[in-house]
Swiss-Prot record:
Part of the 30S ribosomal subunit. Contacts proteins S9 and S11. Coiled coil: none annotated. The gene is rpsG. One of the primary rRNA binding proteins, it binds directly to 16S rRNA where it nucleates assembly of the head domain of the 30S subunit. Is located at the subunit interface close to the decoding center, probably blocks exit of the E-site tRNA. Belongs to the universal ribosomal protein uS7 family. This is Small ribosomal subunit protein uS7. PANTHER family: RIBOSOMAL PROTEIN S7 (PTHR11205). GO terms for molecular function: rRNA binding; structural constituent of ribosome; tRNA binding. The keyword Amino-acid biosynthesis does not apply. One of its GO terms (cellular component) is small ribosomal subunit. It comes from Anaeromyxobacter dehalogenans (strain 2CP-C).
Length: 156
């Protein structure tokens, strides 16, 4: 938190194929060791597979999957008088998107398919139809917040 002025958010250029900032952000999250071209190849390959299997616009399916994975509430630890409480808090819009992307990528990597393209395509299709581990993670997060609703008055 700077004292002088608010730090401006870095502008992310849209991706070359779909001209979409969310896809570009997803590529940046997917990328390892700065290999952006590999990240782009993976996501565009996954989009091709989604289009082939569902006969639908892959960008629409991807955005639907992302919306299905976005959490609304999460719990944060708050220490009050020697006890630590899990306090439910609402998630900011930019953090929702970031968490959804992170979960989609993490659970894609843990899937059983052979290549990352197949794993990501499978997880996107599952998430778009409200199935899969990323959606389960969101449900678990919501359940935790619901279970700890009694501590909501500890919000800061």
């Amino acid at each position: 938190m700077p004292r002088r002025r608010e730090v401006e958010k870095r502008k992310i250029l849209p991706d070359p194929k779909f001209q979409d900032r969310i896809v570009a952000k997803f590529v940046n999250n997917l990328m390892r060791k700065g290999k952006k071209s590999t990240g782009e190849r993976i996501i565009y390959g996954a989009f091709d597979q989604v289009e082939a299997k569902l006969k639908d616009d892959p960008l629409k399916v991807f955005k639907k999957a992302l919306d299905n994975v976005k959490p609304v509430v999460e719990v944060k630890s708050r220490r009050v008088g020697g006890a630590t409480y899990q306090v439910p808090v609402e998630v900011r819009q930019d953090r929702r998107t970031a968490l959804a992307m992170r979960w989609l990528i993490d659970y894609s990597r843990g899937r059983g398919e052979k290549t990352m393209v197949e794993k990501l395509a499978g997880e996107i299709m599952d998430a778009a139809s409200n199935r899969g581990n990323a959606v389960k993670k969101r449900e678990d997060t919501h359940k935790m917040a619901e279970a700890n609703k009694a501590f909501a008055h500890y919000r800061w």
